[in-house]
A protein has these predicted regions:
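Short, polar loop motifs at secondary-structure junctions
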Residues: 104-108, 125-126, 279-283
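Acidic-glycine-rich active-site phosphate/pyrophosphate-binding loop
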Residues: 1-4, 137-160, 205-208
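A short glycine-threonine-serine/GTX helix/turn-capping micro-motif
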Residues: 53, 162-169
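Conserved RecA-like helicase motor-core motifs
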Residues: 12-18, 123-125, 295-299
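ATP-dependent carboxylate-amine ligase
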Residues: 4, 76, 88, 96, ...
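Phosphate-binding loop of NTP-binding sites
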Residues: 1-99, 104, 110-116, 176, ...
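Glycine/charged-rich beta-loop-alpha catalytic/anionic-binding loops adjacent to active sites
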Residues: 10, 125, 151, 155-164, ...
Length: 342
């Protein structure tokens, strides 16, 4: 979304819609391309080896962006090294003269020294070898501000200040990636800053909903341990009573219980008032929280059971994070919260 918003400042852009990022959705997106479209921004989602090879053969990208090597899809990919191997299959059918943009703060991605004898463009906060961010200010749910700097003086972009309308440090990385792509396609610093500042959020992805009773942080499109912790940070930055409604994270393999427990331990010093979990695996989040926080903890087996207790658990003015893997269908919880009167 951030990359598409930036490129749209200069070009006619087609982007992936919803979850059309797999071996069915990607071709359907490509089929919608029109002669007037100048750039396609395509998301590629995988869960096993070989899938990225097939996707990149369809898209043949000129620019490849990998934002991190996290802890998702471990059921098939087993380890973060496996995830790295699967994601870097994207290089197989990319334009050999194209550009690779990587998160230089990621311990796995930083090991990639060249692709087709060309060095990647690294983005980072700690890594300052390419495009980096400094002077980062967290304004809670109002978003972030930062200064994005560029080491490569041959690009069109100079150092610039930017307002990032979506909270979370991950959005700083997304903004740096968008700046790197923008530089590749000849955008100016002003165009990049405008594209980032005017980015729109989608339902289920860091989307803020304000009702008469509640502020809802709808991030229920999907979840893994890295994104779950990022969303907890966003909730922690809000003002007022903080409630996290978290569900199971799928496809984590043999370490699924420990990874859920680790999310719970991440609550330490976050000053979150209430944790509500739904599902069997997320009970491990609750167990982890109890070891590090005085947070009020409640666990439910089903969404229906939880919704019956909304009036007991929630107060008017609460800030509520809703997040789980897509298969948990937490959009139903978001819909119910939107209708709730307290």
């Amino acid at each position: 979304e951030t990359i598409a918003s930036v490129l749209a400042q200069k070009y006619k852009v087609k982007k992936t819609q919803g979850n059309f990022n797999n071996e069915i959705g990607l071709p359907l997106t490509v089929f919608t391309l029109e002669e007037s479209d100048e750039i396609a921004v395509l998301e590629m989602g995988i869960s096993d080896f070989g899938e990225m090879t097939r996707l990149t053969a369809i898209a043949c990208p000129d620019v490849c962006v990998i934002t991190n090597i996290g802890w998702c899809h471990l059921e098939n990919l087993k380890t973060r090294d496996g995830i790295l191997k699967a994601k870097t299959e994207i290089f197989k059918s990319m334009n050999p003269d194209g550009t690779v943009i990587l998160n230089g703060d990621d311990d796995k991605l930083i090991t990639i020294k060249d692709v087709y004898d060309k060095k990647p463009v690294f983005i980072g906060i700690e890594n300052k070898s390419g495009i980096y961010a400094e002077n980062i200010v967290n304004n809670g749910l109002e978003g972030m501000t930062a200064r994005i700097c560029n080491v490569n003086t041959a690009d069109n972009i100079n150092d610039f200040d930017v307002h990032i309308p979506v909270a979370g440090i991950h959005m700083v990385y997304n903004s740096m990636a968008a700046a790197a792509v923008g530089a590749e396609f000849g955008l100016t610093s002003e165009q990049i800053a405008d594209g980032i500042a005017n980015m729109e959020t989608l339902a289920g992805r860091n989307h803020i909903i304000r009702t008469d009773s509640l502020l809802i942080l709808d991030d229920c499109y999907n979840a893994n341990p890295v994104s779950m912790k990022s969303s907890i940070d966003v909730l922690a930055s809000s003002k007022g009573r903080k409630v996290a409604i978290l569900g199971d994270m799928f496809e984590l393999g043999e370490e699924e219980k420990q990874l859920h427990y680790g999310v719970g331990e991440y609550f330490k010093d976050k000053n979150i008032d209430v944790l509500i979990t739904v599902g069997e695996l997320s009970k491990n989040i609750a167990a982890g929280v109890r070891t590090v926080s005085a947070c009020d903890v409640h666990s439910y087996d089903t969404k229906d059971e939880l919704e019956k207790d909304f009036s007991k658990l929630l107060k008017k003015g609460d800030n509520i994070l809703v997040k789980a893997s897509h298969g948990m269908q937490f959009t139903k919880i978001v819909d119910s919260l939107e209708k709730l009167e307290l």
